[in-house]
Amino acid sequence: GPSGFYGVR
């Protein structure tokens, strides 16, 4: 997700 580790995948 947007605030996940990868941002937006």
From Swiss-Prot:
Principal location? secreted
Cellular compartments annotated: Secreted
Q: Which residues carry this modification: Arginine amide?
A: 9
Its GO biological process annotations read: neuropeptide signaling pathway
Keywords noted in UniProt: Amidation, Neuropeptide, Secreted
Q: What is this protein called?
A: Locustatachykinin-1
Its job: Myoactive peptide. Stimulates the contraction of the oviduct and foregut.
Q: Output the Gene Ontology cellular-component terms.
A: extracellular region
Q: What is the lineage of its organism?
A: Eukaryota, Metazoa, Ecdysozoa, Arthropoda, Hexapoda
